[in-house]
Amino acid sequence: MTMVNIINGPNLGRLGRREPDVYGSTTHEQLSALIERAAVEFGIKAVVRQSDSESQLLDWIHLAADAGEPVILNAGGLTHTSVALRDACAELSAPFIEVHISNVHAREEFRRHSYLSPLATGVITGLGVQGYLLALRYLAEIAGN
């Protein structure tokens, strides 16, 4: 059974409280439950993780790379700043989907650059928390589930 790693970066643990006009009212706990229910429906396993620590995100990406497992990554603000995160993602051999809840291209200029997008299999931005479910469905379909 396919295992998908959903990795959320800085400030995403504050979903539902931080800028709900931008990120919506769904909390991280609710998002995790949505993803876990969808994974069961799609016939795959999913583990949802969140950390404000770049070091922890790197560790999780390295584990996924070593296991050959797909990743759905919302690196938050590290998307625009972290070469280390980019280098870790370069080690991923399985599909990697970059997800952003808000449309980063309709926001501040500094949010429009991603160190991760050139490496990603695909990028989903601006579709709210549904972006995670779309990414999960895609990964399930290409895995044959």
Swiss-Prot record:
Mention any Pfam family matching this sequence.
Answer: DHquinase_II
Catalytic activity from the UniProt record: 3-dehydroquinate = 3-dehydroshikimate + H2O
Q: Which NCBIfam families match?
A: aroQ, PRK05395.1-2, PRK05395.1-3, PRK05395.1-4
Which classification does the entry list for the species? Bacteria, Bacillati, Actinomycetota, Actinomycetes, Mycobacteriales
Stored PROSITE patterns: DEHYDROQUINASE_II
Which protein is depicted?
3-dehydroquinate dehydratase
Q: Which InterPro entries match?
A: DHquinase_II, DHquinase_II_CS, DHquinase_II_sf
Q: Give the disulfide map.
A: none
Q: Which organism is it from?
A: Mycobacterium leprae (strain TN)
- Name of encoding gene: aroQ
